[in-house]
Amino acid sequence: MKTGMFTCGHQRLPIEHAFRDASELGYDGIEIWGGRPHAFAPDLKAGGIKQIKALAQTYQMPIIGYTPETNGYPYNMMLGDEHMRRESLDMIKLAMDMAKEMNAGYTLISAAHAGYLTPPNVIWGRLAENLSELCEYAENIGMDLILEPLTPYESNVVCNANDVLHALALVPSPRLFSMVDICAPYVQAEPVMSYFDKLGDKLRHLHIVDSDGASDTHYIPGEGKMPLRELMRDIIDRGYEGYCTVELVTMYMNEPRLYARQALERFRALLPEDE
């Protein structure tokens, strides 16, 4: 089972610390968070991409994916006027360009909250328009685009496996995939494995965390309530061969290396001995 480190937790340290820690602690790859000060797409375009490529080479650490910040601060393709929507889409396109240049395996985005007063037909119409434009761009440059479902605490657009199916049906692009952050189904009493049943080969990536079942908080494995050992055995039995990013975000920023080590050790302890 291949593991990835998410760099978001290192955002108060130089990004080289994330590459160094991923390498020294034994992660198989790294998922780059696209926010300042580390890897904001416009900053990469202005020259910062050279550092990212150099660090990947120095530490021999594959960049499994690039995840620009699209949950509303300041970019949210699902909310705001046409100028805001256009700015968000342009940023995501630039992120795909940067992902391509850093040889990332995918660009991962989400459909953030569309606003409490927005009716469903407007939400889904806007999502379809956005994804259609982004997928056309992804197809032109040869980049896989992953749409991440969020928890209902974060969004009212794509939050479960059926929402993902709807989005994929609206925009049937060979470059559009999805994934599952296992916190999202767990807090909605949705079986995690239903994503495997429903999405098939459109399920491209996993974010592994623990959950309290009542919030979008991402815990280190073992700190929440999820039956992770049993879940991982089911995932292995399904033949999943992609990466699992252990997605520590902002809760552990005071000691990212220590918690990244602990998270990886606990994750590996969940796996059968032959994995």
Swiss-Prot record:
Entries under InterPro entries matching the protein: IolE/XylAMocC-like, Xyl_isomerase-like_sf, Xyl_isomerase-like_TIM-brl
Enzyme Commission (EC) number: 5.1.3.41
Keyword RNA-binding: no
UniProt-listed Gene3D superfamilies: Divalent-metal-dependent TIM barrel enzymes
Keyword set, alphabetical order: Cobalt, Isomerase, Metal-binding, Nickel
GO MF: isomerase activity; metal ion binding
Record-listed a divalent metal cation binding positions: E148, D181, H207, E247
Cofactor(s) the protein needs: Ni(2+); Co(2+)
Active-site feature positions: E148 (proton donor/acceptor), E247 (proton donor/acceptor)
Record-linked Pfam families: AP_endonuc_2 (PF01261)
Record's catalysed reaction(s): N(6)-(D-psicosyl)-L-lysine = N(6)-(D-fructosyl)-L-lysine
Entry note: cofactor: Can use Ni(2+) or Co(2+) in vitro, and, to a lesser extent, Fe(2+) or Mn(2+), but not Ca(2+) or Cu(2+).
Stated family: Belongs to the FrlC family.
Its job: Allows E.coli to utilize psicoselysine for growth. Does not act on psicose or fructoselysine 6-phosphate.
Subunit structure as annotated in this protein's UniProt entry: Homooctamer.
Descriptive protein name: Fructoselysine 3-epimerase
Organism expressing this protein natively: Escherichia coli O157:H7
